[in-house]
Amino acid sequence: MSDTKSGDDKTLSVTPMKTLTLKRPGMEQGTVRQNFSHGRTKSVVVETKKRKFSLPGDKPEPAAAAPVPVFTPKPPVAAAPVVQEAPKAAPPPPPRAPVERSGMVLNELSRSEMEARRRALEGSKVREVEDRQRAAEEAKRRAEDEERRKREREESARRQAEEEARLQAEAESRRRAEEEARRRAPLAAELATADEEEEVKPKRAGAGAPVRRLVTPEVARPAKPTKGEEDRRRGKLTLNSALSDEDARARSLSSMRRRQEKFKRAMHNEPREKVMREVILPETITIQELAQRMSERAVDVVKFFMKQGQILKPGDVIDADTAELVATEFGHTVRRVAESDIEEGLFNIADNAEDLVPRPPVVTIMGHVDHGKTSLLDAIRNANVVSGEAGGITQHIGAYQVEKNGQKITFIDTPGHAAFTAMRARGAQATDIAILVVAADDSVMPQTIESISHAKAAGVPIIVAINKIDKHDADPQKVRSELLRHEVFVESMGGEVLDVEVSATKGTNLDKLLEAILLQAEILDLKANPDRTAEGVVIEAQLDKGRGPVATVLVQTGTLMPGDILVAGNEWGRVRALVNDRGEQIKEAPPAMPVEVLGLQGTPLAGDRFAVVNNEARAREITEYRQRLAREKAVAKHAGQRGSLEQMMSQLQTSGLKEFPLVIKGDVQGSIEAINAALDKLGTDEVRARIVHAGAGAITESDVSLAETSGAAIIGFNVRANVQARAAAAAAGIEIRYYSIIYNLVDDVKAALSGLLSPERRETFIGNAEILEIFDITKVGKIAGCRVTEGKVERGAGVRLIRDNVVIHEGTLKTLKRFKDEVSEVPGGQECGMAFQNYEDMRVGDIIECFRVEMVTRTL
């Protein structure tokens, strides 16, 4: 089949009648004759729609249709300045008509008229001032409006200039794209249906004039006939198949798609602008992840490291400093985050002032041991706590709440023994007011001074309670005078510290003490927000046999309720129950209330802060982070202490350090902490107590196995061993010792450490002897003839040979004779013969010093 265009045919012929139609602009109409097989032809009317393009240097063709209005940005027209019209002067008031005077004229005005005129005059003055102020404000407002309009005009001009620049840039990019598309489109794509021979004619007729054909990229290029085209037209030929042109080969969809993609690539071939990002960097990150966060290729990052002299792989881990350097080099900004950011928002959440309500004060009772702290608290609570403590000594932190006259006060009782320094420090940090109990008959003692230091370090006010004033030797004035030395100035001495003389046994002045506490609390203006998640501090923790881990906590803000998810130190759990100081289960714990919390997964450390979180996932993340941090610190500590095996052995040999291993189990965490601190103080350069394991809870079979492996002794403080542990200890021959008073425990460990000390070598002087003559006896050797000048000389004692006040030899006597008889000792003033063991270099005039050596057992 071939197509011929009838537009160039000049043969005279009769053409059939055509329909009268209007020619559309931009359309070229012609007739194409199609030749089929067997000599058949077919005429087809073809309309070619041309798209107009403007090339550089072309003259615009006259438009056939009405021109379409084109938007052209107009230059900004400066707004006419607003001229503020001056306020017109008020027209003068019309002249008043003369008032006709009556026949009777008063010589002077009345007092009421004078007052009315005076008020009118003052009112006019006030109105004048107000008018001037309004005029000034109006002028200021007009100036501000003018300045605002000026800024708006400048902003409008700037936006219009930016819009013009943007339009010019878009037009330039569009022009470049069209030129690129025109350059790449082949010239043959113009005629989709023209024959090859018909294409040559216009080229010849045009001589040298170039023929410009504009094509659009969207027009599909006609398929060239292939060799096998005639072979495909086989089979039975029908009239329908002969007259239809469905057998013509069409362009495939994939070819059209490839052409469109090629055109898009040509359009978007311009260089892209690099996007700068904010890269979030953790403490460690891999190179691959860093490249993804920067939207860069990992190969480029590896190349950067190669330029710096480092050969790394995309999977290698780098630190935050190196990652920040790389990100900055690639032009990105960096925001570093730490692993500890997971704890952000856990504590110290700010509360609104309108949400705060008054709360009870938290009072800590501090002082020296046996000064009556717990007895004073008993008198306030009308209970008996001392009888429950072993030896009458407080060994735990007790938290109680007392209600007096409708107002609640929370008391925290701390131990006064020297071993419980950490407990006193924790009590001072969790309190609002510190009550310093000083016995009137004992005055200021070391733990009293330490309690003062803890209270000052915590920044809490002090109330001095001078106890035991009922005793005959009580001297409260002496207590006040000694407190001055430690910068505690009571009111009677001209200071600001409140002091109350009380007697815990007789209940004297307890009301005054409570009034002083409430007065100090009113001055402090203690408030908290109960309508939020709870926060506080762990006062004590223990492992109860029937209830599991139990933590005594003090709620400082918020309200703690059963079901809350609690995070305390390295442990977390869901609150199963809340128990108050009287052993009753409660539904909620408001601020400043001490409660026992059940439901934790482990025993937290005393002094840890606790907080309530939203879900278990966050609680687990926080505790895992803290546990990992604690493990890393422990590993670093042991790594620094361990060193190599040779160094450790040489250090032990040179120092001669002996260790006493112990496995300690206690009832509460605070007692374990106090025992550890007390045993650490017993250590010296020669011996020390090494605590293999310390924990809260009963003694178990695993503790016995650990003690057997390490050769340690087992100590139980207010706990007992179960049946399996006792059987295992009896089989292994390990002694288990039980204690209820920390004094006895420390004394026994001190005695055991003293037994590890090597005995002390102590010398006792016996006497001196002077050598008068040297005798050389056959088969015996040299014998020194001496006279005892001081003390006496004993056989078997240690001797030193001194010449010119210098010790020449130290050894023992081989023989001691008087005349020819062996004697055990020679008194002073007598002569004798002496010989040394394995030494004969003696001279006349030497001094022989005799002494006795004793080995004395040492104690710590």
From Swiss-Prot:
Q: Name one GO molecular function term.
A: GTPase activity
Coiled-coil region(s) at which residues? none
Task: Please verify whether the record's keywords include Glycosyltransferase.
Answer: no
Location of the region described as G2 in the Swiss-Prot/TrEMBL record = 392-396
For the region G4, give the residue spans: 467-470
| Taxonomic superkingdom | Bacteria
Q: Which PANTHER family match?
A: TR-TYPE G DOMAIN-CONTAINING PROTEIN (PTHR43381:SF5), TRANSLATION INITIATION FACTOR IF-2-RELATED (PTHR43381)
By sequence similarity, the record places it as follows: Belongs to the TRAFAC class translation factor GTPase superfamily. Classic translation factor GTPase family. IF-2 subfamily.
Q: What is this protein called?
A: Translation initiation factor IF-2
Q: Which organism is it from?
A: Mesorhizobium japonicum (strain LMG 29417 / CECT 9101 / MAFF 303099)
